[in-house]
């Protein structure tokens, strides 16, 4: 088969090329210079991630975003999610420098695996063909398994990696089986947009493939009931790895969910919207209720991430322009407030050796900066105004009200109120309680290598958590623009709102702007 190289439109993958080159450079520098140059590896990774982010900007206005014979689409939707993934990877690098030095872990391999996971997540965000989707998903998954077990001398890390691998392999098998059904039912098509018209009249067989594909995607989202791996993996894995999995991997999963559902299953929108309504409610309820009983900060944030996935799924479940726009905005704000919280946990655990919630008691007396960062990030996760998390949830609930999805709004509001308890409990401990033994023995290592990069990351995430709340109106316009410029999402302007499916309410005819 003759392939026109110009038709490949390979320039749309420049950010991915740069991440790949950075990965190779990190390997070569470590191979040639060894430990002498290990200090430079995180900064090389940061440089590469920064350049890759900069190369995304011109892609916002690409005339032809389709590349590699339809396997990859660099539309504005993928540009936004790839930017989220690159930013989360860069912030993970900032928080990992001191952590790796103090934990005596191999430096080069960590950044190579992190860049590999970043590459897989970016490719997954723009993939529009099933073979490409599976390859990108496995690249992200395999590097994530290795990262979760990176502290190989730690039994908890080994256990976390094994659980993640076994459950992840099962979910990949389920996802692949769902795609194989699609391949057969569509007469051998692998392009998502080509599959849709060929399965629209199939009925139950197509619904079976839909359920299997959704199950595989929901594993990446940590959505209930596919969440069992999350608490153990979050508790046992190195904290910087957990931070990336909670944001970068999840962002790629949501990008895949939007593209797969709107491109391959537009004729089954009522069915998959109803499915995601149930998953969103289960995730919000279980995540927030179980988080209340946690005594470990990392396990609490694990269940918090399950609940946060439920909130984001509100936008996916209602299936309108406003819903997808609110998803994008909430993921963007969640990126900074969640990574900021994990950075604070990293710094505290490095100085005390524990992540128990009670150990944070009286922290304000010893470290006001750390207390401020963690408090603002937790309050933003709780949805307290005027922080970014409040406006993100407000826009999600507003989009649900516009679609008359009152059941989702009810559960979202009730669980948000419940979440305030376990977030504010930590803030109260730090501010008004007597110092714990760990805080009394707290050692500030301000002159240690890597602490300043960690503090810089904490400052960036905290400022973003506050400022994004102030800049929310222009961000809404940006998200709406990205959706209007994405061809595969044009049909959702007149999509049936979820309320007509779940409550039987009369829905407005058009939610387009």
UniProtKB/Swiss-Prot annotation:
Could you say which enzyme class this protein belongs to?
Answer: translocase
Cellular component, GO annotation: plasma membrane
Transmembrane segments annotated in the record for this chain: 12-32, 41-61, 77-97, 104-124, 130-150, 165-185, 199-219, 238-258, 272-292, 300-320, 328-348, 372-392, 394-414, 456-476
What Enzyme Commission number(s) apply to this enzyme?
7.1.1.-
The Gene Ontology terms for molecular function here are: NADH dehydrogenase (ubiquinone) activity; quinone binding
The UniProt annotation puts the region (Disordered) at: 494-513
Provide the primary localization: membrane
Q: Where in the cell is it found?
A: Cell inner membrane
Q: Which reaction does it catalyse?
A: a plastoquinone + NADH + (n+1) H(+)(in) = a plastoquinol + NAD(+) + n H(+)(out); a plastoquinone + NADPH + (n+1) H(+)(in) = a plastoquinol + NADP(+) + n H(+)(out)
Q: Which UniProt keywords apply?
A: Cell inner membrane, Cell membrane, Membrane, NAD, NADP, Plastoquinone, Quinone, Translocase, Transmembrane, Transmembrane helix, Transport
Organism superkingdom? Bacteria
Q: How does it sit in the membrane?
A: Multi-pass membrane protein
Instruction: Extract one GO BP annotation from the record.
Output: ATP synthesis coupled electron transport
Where along the chain is composition biased (Polar residues)? 494-505
Family membership: Belongs to the complex I subunit 2 family.
Q: What does this protein do?
A: NDH-1 shuttles electrons from an unknown electron donor, via FMN and iron-sulfur (Fe-S) centers, to quinones in the respiratory and/or the photosynthetic chain. The immediate electron acceptor for the enzyme in this species is believed to be plastoquinone. Couples the redox reaction to proton translocation, and thus conserves the redox energy in a proton gradient. Cyanobacterial NDH-1 also plays a role in inorganic carbon-concentration.
How does it associate, per the subunit comment?
Answer: NDH-1 can be composed of about 15 different subunits; different subcomplexes with different compositions have been identified which probably have different functions.
PANTHER family (alphabetical): NADH DEHYDROGENASE (PTHR22773)
Query: What's the name of the protein?
Result: NAD(P)H-quinone oxidoreductase subunit 2
């Amino acid at each position: 088969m003759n392939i026109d190289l110009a038709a490949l439109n390979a320039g749309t993958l420049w950010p991915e090329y740069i991440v790949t080159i950075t990965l190779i450079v990190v390997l070569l520098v470590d191979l040639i210079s060894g430990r002498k140059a290990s200090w430079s590896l995180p900064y090389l990774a940061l440089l590469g991630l920064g350049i890759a982010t900069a190369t995304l900007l011109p892609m916002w206005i690409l005339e032809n975003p389709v590349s590699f014979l339809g396997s990859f689409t660099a539309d504005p939707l993928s540009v936004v999610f790839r930017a989220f993934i690159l930013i989360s990877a860069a912030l993970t690098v900032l928080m990992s420098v001191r952590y790796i030095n103090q934990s005596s872990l191999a430096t080069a391999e960590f950044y190579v695996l992190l860049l590999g996971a970043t590459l897989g997540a970016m490719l997954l965000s723009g993939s529009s063909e099933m073979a490409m989707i599976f390859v990108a998903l496995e690249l992200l998954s395999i590097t994530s398994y290795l990262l979760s077990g990176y502290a190989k001398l730690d039994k908890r890390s080994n256990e976390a990696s094994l659980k993640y691998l076994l459950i992840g392999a099962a979910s990949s098998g389920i996802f692949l089986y769902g795609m194989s059904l699609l391949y057969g039912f569509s007469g051998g098509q692998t392009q998502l947009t080509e599959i849709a018209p060929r399965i629209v009249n199939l009925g139950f067989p197509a619904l079976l493939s839909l359920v299997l594909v959704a199950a595989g995607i929901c594993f990446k989202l940590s959505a209930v009931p596919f969440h069992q791996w999350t608490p153990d993996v979050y508790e046992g894995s190195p904290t910087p790895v957990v931070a990336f999995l909670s944001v970068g991997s999840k962002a790629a999963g949501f990008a895949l969910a939007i593209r797969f559902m709107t491109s391959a299953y537009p004729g089954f929108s009522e069915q998959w919207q109803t499915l995601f309504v149930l998953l969103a409610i289960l995730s919000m309820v279980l995540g927030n209720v179980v988080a209340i009983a946690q005594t470990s900060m990392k396990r609490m944030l694990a269940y918090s991430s399950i609940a946060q996935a439920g909130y984001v799924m509100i936008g996916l479940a209602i299936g309108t322009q406003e819903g997808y726009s609110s998803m994008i905005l909430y993921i963007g704000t969640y990126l900074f407030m969640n990574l900021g919280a994990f950075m604070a946990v990293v710094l505290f655990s490095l100085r005390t050796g524990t992540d128990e919630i009670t150990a944070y008691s009286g922290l304000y007396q010893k470290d006001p900066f750390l207390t401020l960062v963690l408090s603002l990030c937790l309050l933003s996760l709780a949805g307290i105004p005027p922080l970014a998390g409040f406006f993100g949830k407000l826009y999600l609930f507003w989009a649900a009200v516009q679609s008359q999805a009152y059941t989702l709004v009810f559960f979202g509001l009730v669980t948000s109120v419940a979440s305030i308890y376990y977030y504010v409990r930590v803030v109260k401990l730090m501010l008004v309680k007597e110092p714990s033994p760990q805080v009394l023995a707290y050692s500030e290592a301000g002159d240690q290598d890597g602490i300043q990069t960690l503090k810089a990351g904490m400052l960036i995430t905290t400022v973003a958590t506050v400022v994004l709340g102030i800049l929310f109106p222009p961000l809404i316009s940006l998200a709406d623009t990205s959706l209007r410029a994405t061809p595969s999402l044009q049909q959702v302007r007149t999509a049936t709102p979820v309320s007509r499916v779940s409550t039987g309410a009369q829905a407005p005819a058009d939610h387009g702007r």
